[in-house]
């Protein structure tokens, strides 16, 4: 799987505290190899929200929302649970 970053994701990522960026980096390193392999993504908290729309957990309060397009995972949003809910409601 290839990771692609939306402009909104990059903007939100840059606004994170350095420790949150480190948690996010760790999750993003594990995501491509773990996606589609249930036993590998146990620590990521990866789950489907809708068809082709997913979220994973970077830390207890930080989540990453993304969509799947063939062999590419497009990272759309990073933030707390409310940010993911807002993204789902407004963008999809």
Regions found by a protein language model. Give the residues of each.
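Preference for short coil/turn "hinge" residues that link or interrupt alpha-helices
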Residues: 9, 37-42, 71, 77
């Amino acid at each position: 799987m290839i990771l692609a970053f939306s402009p909104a994701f990059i903007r939100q990522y840059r606004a994170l505290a350095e420790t949150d960026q480190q948690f996010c980096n760790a999750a993003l390193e594990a995501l491509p190899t773990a996606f589609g392999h249930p036993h590998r993504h146990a620590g990521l908290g990866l789950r489907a929200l809708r068809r082709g729309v997913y979220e994973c957990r970077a830390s207890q309060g930080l989540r990453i929302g993304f969509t799947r397009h063939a062999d590419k995972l497009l990272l759309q949003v990073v933030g707390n649970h409310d940010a993911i809910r807002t993204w789902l409601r407004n963008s999809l």
